[in-house]
Each structure stands twice: as structure tokens, then as C-alpha cells.
A protein has these predicted regions:
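N-terminal secretory signal peptides that target proteins for export/translocation
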Residues: 1-4
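N-terminal export leaders
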Residues: 7-8
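C-terminal segment of classical bacterial N-terminal signal peptides
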Residues: 17-24
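Extracellular receptor-binding modules and their adjoining Ser/Thr/Gly/Asp/Asn-rich linkers
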Residues: 25-78, 89-100, 105-137
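Cysteine-dependent deubiquitinase/ubiquitin-like isopeptidase catalytic cores across multiple families
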Residues: 83
């Protein structure tokens, strides 16, 4: 009898944990914004629609600057958190040396990103890289 009660308690606790996790993930979906942006600054995918356009300014052999301009009203205030990561894997140099970084503090109007390639044998390597951007309220 004690065994059945313990099993029942574990099942109920597990169900509550799953239900609360589902609620948290549903709420998190409302507060996270993601985008895939090409090395030329074209937005390939975004969820939800939160990016108006991207200004791309390449600096040959050094870095590429991207200003991601946000849709009006996407953020009432500056994002609480943003992260960026290079997704180019065309060569081993891209895998090992390509980097993307936030360039300054994100605002409710824009997020600045730079991409560059460090340690490459080619000093004139293309610094423009495709990247994924994620911001959260």
C-alpha cells in the first residue's frame, strides 16, 4: 500500500513538473526573439517578426559591422539579453576562427553586431559572416 502511494505521489509530482515546464516554455516563447541573418545582411528567418532591416558595412580584412534595426514596438525598452553566434561552416577557417560579437549595448531600436575572422592565414579574409541572433525581453 505504501509503495502504491509513493508511486502515485511521484506520478502527480512528475505531471505537475511537466505542466509547469510547459507553462514556462510557453511564456518564454513570448519573450524570446530569434533571427538568422546572412553575411550580406539579409534576414533569412525570424520569429516573431521583430527586425525591420539590417545595415551591413564590411571592412575588408578586418571586420564587418551589422546594425540590426528593430521593428517599431518590438521592444518597449532595451532587450534584457542578446546573444549572437556565427553559423558559417564553409571552411575550417570559418569553424575555428570566425566570431560574432555584440558591438555595444542593445537598444529598443537596434542591435549592433560585428563579425570577424581571427588567426586566419589569409590577411584579406572575408570578415562578413552569417549569424544567428537571439534577444529576450
Amino acid at each position: 500500500m505504501l509503495y502504491r502511494r509513493n508511486v502515485l505521489i511521484r506520478l502527480i509530482a512528475g505531471g505537475l513538473l511537466l505542466a509547469s515546464g510547459h507553462k514556462v516554455s510557453a511564456e518564454a516563447a513570448n519573450f524570446s526573439y530569434t533571427a538568422l541573418i546572412t553575411s550580406q545582411g539579409k534576414v533569412l528567418a525570424q520569429s516573431p517578426v521583430w527586425i525591420s532591416y539590417v545595415n551591413h558595412a564590411p571592412r575588408a580584412g578586418y571586420f564587418s559591422d551589422y546594425k540590426v534595426v528593430l521593428e517599431e514596438g518590438a521592444f518597449d525598452r532595451s532587450p534584457g539579453f542578446c546573444a549572437v553566434s556565427v553559423v558559417d561552416v564553409d571552411s575550417l577557417d570559418d569553424v575555428f576562427y570566425a566570431q560574432a560579437k555584440l558591438s555595444g549595448t542593445p537598444t529598443r531600436h537596434s542591435v549592433k553586431v560585428i563579425t570577424h575572422q581571427i588567426g586566419s592565414a589569409d590577411p584579406q579574409a572575408n570578415a562578413s559572416k552569417s549569424f544567428m541572433l537571439m534577444c529576450a525581453k
